[in-house]
UniProtKB/Swiss-Prot annotation:
Record-level Gene Ontology MF annotations: urease activity
Protein name: Urease subunit beta
E.C. number(s) listed in UniProt: 3.5.1.5
Subunit structure of this chain's protein: Heterotrimer of UreA (gamma), UreB (beta) and UreC (alpha) subunits. Three heterotrimers associate to form the active enzyme.
Superkingdom of origin organism: Bacteria
Reaction catalysed by this enzyme: urea + 2 H2O + H(+) = hydrogencarbonate + 2 NH4(+)
Designated gene of the protein: ureB
Similarity comment: Belongs to the urease beta subunit family.
Cellular component GO terms, alphabetical: urease complex
Length: 101
């Protein structure tokens, strides 16, 4: 077994069940690849990504923990976001919130 490995019965795993989700179109308008991790506050991602940041406030990518999505230069893709849970406080990242949402 590899550290962090999950052994399942093979059935589909459901993540973030019951949480509000949002689908957005995101474009990498920069000249460099941009990668965003699973728990990064999406509204605070690299300024080279073009999307509705106000709509993404308080949300993260709806992907498995520890994974990421990569946006190549000029690439446009549709992503799904999910509400942050817990205390709904955001600290760090680009410093745009620094507290309660």
């Amino acid at each position: 077994m590899t550290p962090g490995e999950l052994l399942t019965d093979g059935a589909d795993l459901v993540i973030n069940s019951g949480r509000r989700t949002l689908t957005l179109v995101v474009e990498n308008a920069s000249d460099r690849p941009i990668q965003v991790g699973s728990h990064y506050h999406f509204a605070e991602t690299n300024a080279g990504l073009s999307f509705d940041r106000a709509a993404a406030r308080g949300m993260r990518l709806n992907i498995a923990s520890g994974t990421a999505v990569r946006f190549e230069p000029g690439q446009q893709r549709t992503i799904e976001l999910v509400d942050l849970a817990g205390d709904r406080q955001v600290w760090g990242f680009r410093g745009l919130v620094q507290g309660r949402l």
